[in-house]
Amino acid sequence: MDIFLCPVCQSGYRYFYTLYLPNNNIDVILFCDECECVWIDPEYIDYQDAVSNDFLVDKYKVTSCKILFNKEISGWSTNKDIKNSRWDNFIENYEQFVFQNIYHLDKNKRYPFLYLYATN
């Protein structure tokens, strides 16, 4: 089984994604680029470990998940985001989870979710 392939939809790939938190902080999650499933703990990344929108709303004390995915601030995680998160040890063995590595982009820039779909 390909650990990078989403175990829920089995057609998308999972990458680190940085959420915007209302207190001007950020948090890093594992996020499927196809079905948008979310995993919040590096110890739990299997099918049954994906969390719901309701769980995210409760965990981060927000009224809507849209706040967490604020397109002005949130985006595919930078190396710095990951290194400063609970995923730091996990990334040492799984660099393919870094969106910028796969698409050969600047690893210090946080690209928005729709980056690959944008037209210039």
Swiss-Prot record:
It is found in: Virion. Its main location: virion. GO terms for cellular component: virion component. Keywords: Virion. This is Uncharacterized protein L48. It comes from Acanthamoeba polyphaga mimivirus.
